[in-house]
């Protein structure tokens, strides 16, 4: 089956069960295509409702790959967090229903391809097969402690050329994910920026012979490679939409402050803008 058709078909099946935007899922799918010839399985830390893990399982099946997926989640939400580095993330956030996830797995016919391990990472990882190895990992743990636990387990088991995708790597007000990555993998990371707050890297070497030439930009004292982000038209379109959205948000907020502070009346356009604030469009 054509890879684009595989993506569209399977994204449509899992879209109601993931908080990831379509562009973010596409980026992870591209990583799967890049590492599909490597040995090792796929693993997701922080599977939530199962959408991304099941998407990977569906794609593995359609592409005829000899791989499986392991999904780990506490199903109790986040563990204790550190507000100084984890920002808005708090204990208990992002809890999900284990039975609903298992039901979705059965409905999709993925029992043989996707293993769901319920529990805190420390407990679940201690029960993993000793010979486990991985070519693709999606870390959606959101916070410092969980991300560091996941990376410490993953690094010795990641095959050469394997890809690691970090969600919420650039989440506003939260630096826990990137700090954990730097502590485990080293400060001099080649971070490829993905859609939204996503970044990915190849800790043991980039296997892509046709990878684009780096396009470096700095943010917050760290360097990010934008080449992959700028290579796809849908990513550029998403960036343009986000820029317009946040410009409108900023204008509305300025008008709001004028309103409550008794300054000159806000623009008429701000009332229209308020109807759009908070709507997140999936692309």
Which residues are covered by each model-predicted region?
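S-adenosylmethionine/decaboxylated-SAM
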Residues: 1-22, 29, 36-282
